Each structure stands twice: as structure tokens, then as C-alpha cells.
């Protein structure tokens, strides 16, 4: 399918994962406005990279990493058709290969890393291999993703990811091993009156892993927030409207 946003267009017909509300929420909520060097892991159609480009200062550089051949072609096409063809650069390959090359070349770390990751560690996989890789941790496990974040994120940087409820605990439990913690967590409720079914995490380096815990260096705490997408009548909430107004045509 094709999706037209206020400032760019996305063709995702060849991608394992189509444009989704999850991705739009992630791209709209992530704190990108002060970032000058952004990494999009598993870029797919390039949606998050282009949302980041729209929200970022003109001097920002963005690297979109995508391993799937068809998705990489779609991503490159969407980038070239956008107003930010000079801002967003595509790396076609595995994030592990990108990390190794990046570290070997002693290139600058990233102020912000954004990722809508494969999140199912178990369960029935789609017959389409591209969709299976996009949904399951076949090519990028939670541990591998967190290791990449720990290696490529600048000391004061933030990584933003979105996960369904069933994957949240497993992901968070592994963060400490890589010197990371959840600074902010946005729990998302699809319809008013329901329970949250996915969360966006703002991940940062854990300062207590580098320095002993003291009165002046207390244990880090997570800030918890919550938003509802639609009310009981199916209308977008004011929070949803405010968040997505810069992107959705009809808001």
C-alpha cells in the first residue's frame, strides 16, 4: 500500500511490515528535535527516518539501516522522493555489520537511535520470510539490539523503541546487562477503558553502572506516562491528535 503524509509519501508494498500506527506513534513521540545524528535500525520503508527528518534541525544526519533487499529498495525510493534525500542515508545490510564498520572507522556516536524492532521471540511465524523477519527475532535478538544500542549511543543519547506487552518484561530485564535503563515509558491504550497493550521506551545509558550509587548519584528511576489512542466512540483522543497532527493529513 501507499501512504501520503503531510510532508512525504511512503510506498511500502515490498516491505515485510506495512506502515502502522505503532510506527507513527514511535516516530512522533521520540525526543528527536535536539538530535543531530540519528540511527534508524530496521528502517523498513523508511517511515521513521523520514519522520525524524521532518522533526529535526536542518543540520541533522540520519542513517537508515535495513537488511531486507526489497525493503531496502523501497526505503531508498521513498528517501529519494522526499524533501530529505540529502539528510537520510541508507545502509543496506545487517545492523551488526554496520556497527562493526562504524566502530572500525571511529565515527561519531548517535544522539538518538530509533527502532521498531522484531519483537516475537517465539510463536508461529509468517510464511513470508520478510514478514517473519520483521516480526520475529530471527535476524536481531533483543540481546543483539541492546548490545548495538550500548555501543552506538552517545553518552547522553536516547534510544526509542516500541514493544507489545508480551515482549516488554523480557526486553527490560536484559537492559542492565548492557548498562542501559528505561528513562521513560509510555504505555499505550488502544481504546478508552481497555488496558495498555504496547509501550514506547526511552532508553539511556545507566549512570549507576559507571559510578557507585551515592546520595548524589541515586538509583535511576523510570518516568511512567500513559496515552489513549481512541475514545469509546472510536474518535482520536486529544493526545493522539496533538502527537500526530504534524503527519496525518486529516488532523
From Swiss-Prot:
Cellular compartments per GO CC: cytoplasm
EC primary class: transferase
A UniProt-annotated Pfam family: MTS
Localisation: Cytoplasm
GO aspect biological process, one term: tRNA processing
Gene3D superfamilies in the cross-refs: Vaccinia Virus protein VP39
Domain of life assignment: Bacteria
Entry EC no(s): 2.1.1.223
GO molecular function, one term: rRNA (adenine-N6,N6-)-dimethyltransferase activity
PROSITE patterns according to UniProt: N6_MTASE
Catalytic activity of the protein: adenosine(37) in tRNA1(Val) + S-adenosyl-L-methionine = N(6)-methyladenosine(37) in tRNA1(Val) + S-adenosyl-L-homocysteine + H(+)
Keyword entries, A-Z: Cytoplasm, Methyltransferase, S-adenosyl-L-methionine, Transferase, tRNA processing
Its biological purpose: Specifically methylates the adenine in position 37 of tRNA(1)(Val) (anticodon cmo5UAC).
Family recorded in the similarity comment: Belongs to the methyltransferase superfamily. tRNA (adenine-N(6)-)-methyltransferase family.
Annotated HAMAP family: tRNA_methyltr_YfiC (MF_01872)
Name by which UniProt lists this protein: tRNA1(Val) (adenine(37)-N6)-methyltransferase
Organism, scientific name: Shewanella frigidimarina (strain NCIMB 400)
Amino acid at each position: 500500500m501507499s501512504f501520503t503524509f503531510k510532508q512525504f509519501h511512503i510506498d511500502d508494498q515490498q516491505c515485510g511490515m506495512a506502515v502502522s500506527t505503532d510506527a507513527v506513534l514511535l516516530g512522533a513521540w521520540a525526543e528527536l528535535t535536539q538530535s543531530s545524528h540519528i540511527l534508524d535500525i530496521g528502517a523498513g520503508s523508511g517511515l521513521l527516518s523520514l519522520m525524524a527528518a521532518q522533526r529535526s534541525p536542518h543540520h541533522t544526519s540520519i542513517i537508515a539501516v535495513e537488511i531486507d533487499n526489497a525493503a531496502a529498495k523501497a526505503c531508498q525510493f521513498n528517501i529519494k522522493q522526499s524533501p530529505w534525500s540529502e539528510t537520510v542515508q541508507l545502509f543496506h545490510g545487517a545492523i551488526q555489520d554496520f556497527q562493526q564498520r562504524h566502530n572500525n572507522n571511529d565515527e561519531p556516536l548517535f544522539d538518538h537511535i530509533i527502532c521498531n524492532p522484531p519483537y516475537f521471540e517465539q510463536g508461529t511465524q509468517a510464511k513470508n520470510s520478510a514478514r517473519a523477519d520483521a516480526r520475529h527475532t530471527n535476524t536481531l535478538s533483543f540481546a543483539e539490539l541492546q548490545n548495538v544500542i550500548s555501543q552506538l549511543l552517545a553518552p547522553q543519547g536516547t534510544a526509542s523503541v516500541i514493544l507489545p506487552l508480551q515482549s516488554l518484561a523480557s526486553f527490560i530485564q536484559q537492559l542492565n546487562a548492557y548498562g542501559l535503563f528505561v528513562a521513560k515509558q509510555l504505555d499505550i491504550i488502544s481504546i478508552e477503558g481497555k488496558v495498555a497493550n504496547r509501550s514506547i521506551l526511552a532508553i539511556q545509558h545507566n549512570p549507576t553502572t559507571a559510578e557507585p550509587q551515592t546520595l548524589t548519584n541515586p538509583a535511576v528511576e523510570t518516568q511512567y506516562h500513559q496515552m489513549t489512542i481512541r475514545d469509546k466512540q472510536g474518535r482520536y483522543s486529544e493526545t493522539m491528535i496533538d502527537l500526530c497532527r504534524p503527519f496525518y493529513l486529516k488532523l
